[in-house]
Every structure is written in structure tokens, then in C-alpha cells.
């Protein structure tokens, strides 16, 4: 027989839990023109009602008894921004991969917390962390203990031995062959070296076990790493197909780090649904991306000659400099191919190994280049609705299943209120034409007057 006294205690516990759960009033944002994340024009003056963490309604004459009211004073209300390629654990590590390997977990975590706060103050209410970070900080942000964007985490890098994500120092042999302990970054689950089908399956499943929303695999050579030349094709078709099967079993997707046609096409043949970088792509492969509906996540500022003003890439004695020079020289056709074929581009900042000041300059310049090369509307969609579409590719494994990157009924209430019209001038969201020569600024962007994430206001300077 059930214990009636115990049942009453349990019932009382749940009632008290409901009574003490955080409750905040509805918010009615009035007198605004809305850019909804997809349209090519602003609405006429209207209102948006937020209830809980969702957009409840849009339009004039909304019923909102008891709601907190915000007068937008004719400003533009738009979706919160989405950065589809960040590395929060690497953002404020100075000195590159070697410095990261030498870092303690406290140093890495502290940098990631600072980077998360920085992203939210830059208007990014959602980020896709592309490797090197688990879900601990994500969970603490979701719980309200830390301030930052919602995070879609890929978990640890998955890399082959001597792949782009193999961040071991030259003095550190492979633990498997040497019978020694793993490197610091392996031990901290920043990277996983996986060779062969069994290792690949185990690495994918381990990332999911630790909370990854999707999987990121290094499928080709990189610039910032020292063990792999830029031209190298990484992993075999069998290994990538095994990863694809493991990922699909979780009803989510996987993306790859890949620059050139051979690495991109091998990944697509195996089932990848997103390509990150791709700056060395050819026209035939670009057409394939468009035909198959593949997402393209590309960082643009890195194709500039200004890249060599960065201390890591400008050091002519470094092997990283040699690879960066080859990369910049060979990426000249990329922008023309994107303009011509209009792939499913999402915004990608990929800012690593920087100071706070440089982080802000780089982010502002990345926004500017996206608009300059592709037009403001194309860039803004990549920063909002298209980023939301990519987030939704996580399917039943989506940690935030409501719609992102748009202003419509039922979507998550991630909103920015800005001075100016971003469709005409991206400086409304902080874009700046200078990179290293840009003036230093504070953490927040002055033209972004209000930042709301998940229905809660994190900045209001009205």
C-alpha cells in the first residue's frame, strides 16, 4: 500500500516548487519597426508581446494587461544574433595552440566565461561552439548562474593523428603508441584523437554522452595547427561514414572543418550537412553545396591581408605564417562564388587567441565584411534566421527546440532593439570598416539599446 503521508509530502513539495519557480511579467515592446529575420523590409510601426521566454504575438492593439511596457521610440526591433562558429575556450588564450596546451582548466574555463559574456554584449544570443568546449558552462548559463548566450556545443574536437585538431606539442608522442598519459588538452576533453572506425564511433558517442548537440570533425588541413599541412585530406571515407551513422542515430547532424574541394567532397559523400570554412572551394563544389542544401559557415575577415597583422599569423618564422599566406593567396575567388550561387551561408567569426580589444575589433570587422561582400540582407539572414535553421538541424536532440533567429509567434524571445536600420547600415549592430586600426570600444555596442535573451533583459539603455 502506498504511504499516504509520504504522498501528501511529495504533492506539497511540487506545489511549493511551482510557487517558488521564477515568474516574470509579460513584456510589451511598443512603437517599433520590426525586421523579422527573413523579410527584405521593415514593418510599419507595431508591437511585440513576450510571454515567458517566447514571442506571444506581434501587431498593433495587443492585449497586455499587467505587462511591463517598453517604448521603442520608433527604433528597429530584430532577432538576437547567432554566431555559428565560435571557440569560447580559445578566445582569450594568448600564444596559440602551445599556450592552450599549457593552460590549466581554471584558466581555460575563466576565459570561456569571459568570452560568453562578451558574445552576449555583442548582441549574440545564441552561439554554436565548434569544438574544445563541453557543456558545463552552457548548463550554468541555462541555470542563470552565468551570463552568456545559449550554446550549441560540439564537444571535443574529433581529429585524426596529425590532423587539424591534434594540438599535441612535438615533444608529446601519441599516448597509444608511447604508453604514456594523454596530452593536457586530451585529458581536459578539448580534443579527441580518433583513428579507425572503432575509435571514430567511440569519439562521437563520447561527445554525445557529455552533452554535445551535434558533432564537428576535422576533415582537412588547417591554418592555426602545426602538425598538418593545408593540403592534407584527413580521415578515410570509411571513418567518416561511420561517424555519419553514429550521428544520424542521435537524430542530429555533423559538420566538418574543410577548406578545399577534395576534403569538402569526401565529407559530403559521407553525409556531412554543413561545411565550415571552405574558402578554397571551386565552382563545381559550390554548385553541389547549393544543390544539396548544405550549410556554409565561413569566416571572412581571415581572407584579408590584414590577417598578417595578427601576432600569431604575422610571425614569419612560424609555420603557421606559411600556411596562412598560402590560404590567403588561394581564397581570392571565394566571395565571387558565394555572390553568384547564394549558398546557405551562416555567420562565422572563429575568433581565437586574442585580447579583449582585438576580439571586439575582429567581431565588428567580420560583420562589416559580410555586408560589404554579400549585401546587408544576405549577411543579416546569416546572422539570424539561417543560423536558426542550422540550429534546428539538431532535430530531436535540440537542446532549445523552439524556433530561433526570427520574430514570429512561438519563437524564442531573443531580441535586439537598435538605433538605425540594419538593412541599410550594419553599424546598427556594431559593424565597423576598420580591423586593427578600429578604435577601442567598451564591451557593449552603444547602438544596441536593448538585449533580450530567452525573455529576460540583459541590457536596456533606453
Report the location of each language-model feature.
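Active-site core of metal-dependent hydrolases
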Residues: 154, 161, 217-333, 346-354, ...
Amino acid at each position: 500500500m502506498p504511504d499516504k503521508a509520504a504522498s501528501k509530502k511529495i504533492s506539497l513539495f511540487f506545489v511549493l516548487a511551482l510557487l517558488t519557480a521564477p515568474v516574470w511579467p509579460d513584456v510589451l515592446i511598443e512603437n517599433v519597426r520590426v525586421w523579422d529575420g527573413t523579410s527584405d523590409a521593415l514593418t510599419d510601426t507595431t508591437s511585440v508581446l513576450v510571454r515567458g521566454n517566447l514571442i506571444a504575438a506581434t501587431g498593433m492593439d495587443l492585449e497586455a494587461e499587467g505587462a511591463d511596457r517598453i517604448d521603442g521610440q520608433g527604433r528597429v526591433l530584430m532577432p538576437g544574433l547567432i554566431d555559428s562558429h565560435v571557440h569560447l575556450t580559445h578566445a582569450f588564450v594568448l600564444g596559440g595552440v602551445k599556450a592552450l596546451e599549457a593552460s590549466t582548466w581554471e584558466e581555460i574555463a575563466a576565459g570561456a566565461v569571459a568570452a560568453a559574456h562578451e558574445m552576449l554584449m555583442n548582441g549574440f544570443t545564441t552561439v554554436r561552439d565548434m569544438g574544445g568546449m563541453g557543456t558545463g558552462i552552457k548548463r550554468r548559463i541555462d541555470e542563470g548562474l552565468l551570463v552568456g548566450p545559449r550554446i550549441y556545443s560540439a564537444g571535443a574536437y574529433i581529429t585524426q593523428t596529425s590532423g587539424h585538431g591534434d594540438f599535441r606539442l612535438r615533444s608529446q608522442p601519441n599516448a597509444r603508441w608511447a604508453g604514456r598519459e594523454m596530452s593536457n588538452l586530451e585529458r581536459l576533453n578539448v580534443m579527441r584523437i580518433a583513428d579507425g572506425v572503432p575509435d571514430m564511433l567511440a569519439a562521437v558517442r563520447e561527445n554525445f554522452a557529455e552533452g554535445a548537440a551535434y558533432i564537428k570533425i576535422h576533415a582537412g588541413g588547417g591554418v592555426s595547427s602545426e602538425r598538418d599541412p593545408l593540403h592534407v585530406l584527413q580521415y578515410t571515407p570509411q571513418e567518416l561514414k561511420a561517424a555519419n551513422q553514429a550521428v544520424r542515430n542521435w537524430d542530429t547532424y555533423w559538420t566538418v572543418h574543410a577548406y578545399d574541394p577534395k576534403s569538402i567532397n569526401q565529407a559530403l559523400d559521407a553525409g556531412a550537412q554543413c561545411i565550415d570554412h571552405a574558402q578554397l572551394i571551386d565552382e563545381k563544389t559550390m554548385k553541389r553545396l547549393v544543390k544539396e542544401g548544405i550549410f556554409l559557415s565561413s569566416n571572412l575577415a581571415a581572407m584579408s591581408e590584414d590577417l598578417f597583422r595578427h601576432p600569431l599569423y604575422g610571425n614569419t618564422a612560424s609555420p603557421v605564417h606559411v600556411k596562412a599566406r598560402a590560404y590567403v593567396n588561394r581564397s581570392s575567388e571565394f566571395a565571387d562564388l558565394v555572390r553568384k550561387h547564394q549558398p546557405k551561408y551562416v555567420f562565422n567569426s572563429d575568433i581565437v587567441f586574442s585580447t579583449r580589444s582585438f576580439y571586439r575589433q575582429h567581431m565588428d570587422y567580420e560583420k562589416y565584411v559580410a555586408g560589404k561582400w554579400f549585401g546587408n540582407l544576405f549577411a543579416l539572414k546569416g546572422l539570424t534566421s539561417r543560423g536558426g535553421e542550422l540550429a534546428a538541424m539538431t532535430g530531436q536532440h535540440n537542446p532549445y527546440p523552439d524556433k530561433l533567429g526570427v520574430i514570429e509567434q512561438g519563437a524564442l524571445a531573443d531580441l535586439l532593439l537598435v538605433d538605425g536600420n540594419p538593412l541599410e547600415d550594419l553599424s546598427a549592430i556594431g559593424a565597423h570598416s576598420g580591423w586593427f586600426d578600429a578604435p577601442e570600444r567598451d564591451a557593449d555596442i552603444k547602438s544596441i539599446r536593448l538585449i533580450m535573451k530567452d525573455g529576460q533583459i540583459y541590457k536596456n539603455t533606453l
